[in-house]
Design a protein with these regions (language model features):
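N-terminal phosphate/diphosphate-binding loop that engages ATP/GTP or pyrophosphate donors
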Residues: 4-80, 84, 89-92
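Glycine-rich phosphate-binding loop signature in dinucleotide/nucleotide-binding domains
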Residues: 93-98
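Conserved catalytic-core segment of NTP-binding enzymes
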Residues: 9, 99, 104-166
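Conserved glycine(s) of the Walker
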Residues: 1
């Protein structure tokens, strides 16, 4: 759901005449090219759907093969996310584009890195990049409670929630 909504948002911005871009700190569950490099699947989908003029290599600094939570994929693949790398990539995209749609890597409390050296959560990325959020949720049983808890957690921790999409 998040990737589809991000693609719709990026497309709407591009169709409105803005130099729009997309960014995601970490993406897991990707397939390999014949040369062994990973294809950032979510980034590719958004780029193609929204017709963005942006190279895939600028869209996501951490790309993992295993379809696991980013912190587990990072541990298994030996490439843990570093906040300065995420910030630098985001700033570079912002310098080249008028507006950037940022997709979360999981929910607000999803760990991107959780090892003996550092604990990095999606919440940290949202705070450090100064982002406002739109919560994207499935319209299923139990979702209202989950969304309200997420929104209240975010507000209590100073994170702006601009909307909710079911």
């Amino acid at each position: 759901g998040k990737t589809y909504v991000a693609a719709l948002m990026a497309k709407a911005l591009k169709d409105a005449g803005l130099n729009a871009a997309y960014y995601k700190a970490a993406v897991s569950g990707n397939v390999r090219r014949p040369d062994g490099s990973l294809i950032p699947g979510d980034a590719r989908f958004v780029r193609e759907f929204a017709h963005l003029d942006q190279g895939e290599e600028t869209m996501c600094p951490y790309v993992y093969e295993h379809a696991w939570s980013p912190h587990l994929a990072a541990q298994a693949e030996g490439n843990p996310p570093e906040l300065p790398v995420i910030q630098k990539g985001f700033q570079a995209v912002c310098q080249q584009h008028e507006i950037v749609t940022v997709e979360g890597s999981g929910g607000i409390l999803c760990p991107l890195r959780h090892d003996e050296k550092e604990k990095l959560w999606l919440e940290d990325v949202v705070q450090q990049l100064g982002l406002a959020s739109v919560i994207v949720a499935h319209a299923g049983l139990g979702t209202i409670n989950s969304v309200v808890l997420t929104a209240e957690y975010m507000r209590a921790n100073g994170l702006a929630v601009k909307g909710i999409i079911f």
